[in-house]
Amino acid sequence: MILVDTSVWIEHLRAADARLVELLGDDEAGCHPLVIEELALGSIKQRDVVLDLLANLYQFPVVTHDEVLRLVGRRRLWGRGLGAVDANLLGSVALVGGARLWTRDKRLKAACAESGVALAEEVS
């Protein structure tokens, strides 16, 4: 299962991403409540339809506040320009066996690599 980050969804909503379409068709794309919240704060066409579709994808688990703080401390994630949502996504992917994170955020990619969280490969 691949957790699709907000950065990928934003680009997909502007111009369809063929790889994401394929992952969706194969039920391999998952979402996270915080990604849905981030997208809900933006201007998106067919807002209700899109948010409903996202909510019906596989939902990655929400980690607790204490779990996020432990992750930040153990992996030394402070001072890297990551946000709270980024840390939550890292923790969430780490909880799901075999899961990967697909992001276009450079700082989040670097944190994944350093934390041992698998990244989904970009396909050009």
Swiss-Prot record:
InterPro entries: PIN-like_dom_sf, PIN_dom, VapC_family. This is Ribonuclease VapC32. GO terms for biological process: negative regulation of growth. The keyword Metal-binding applies. It is an enzyme of class 3 (hydrolase). Pfam families: PIN. One of its GO terms (molecular function) is RNA nuclease activity. Its cofactor is Mg(2+). Keywords: Hydrolase, Magnesium, Metal-binding, Nuclease, Toxin-antitoxin system. Toxic component of a type II toxin-antitoxin (TA) system. An RNase. Upon expression in M.smegmatis inhibits colony formation. Its toxic effect is neutralized by coexpression with cognate antitoxin VapB32. Residues 2-112 form the PINc domain. Mg(2+) binds at D5, D86. Its EC number is 3.1.-.-. Belongs to the PINc/VapC protein family. The gene is vapC32.
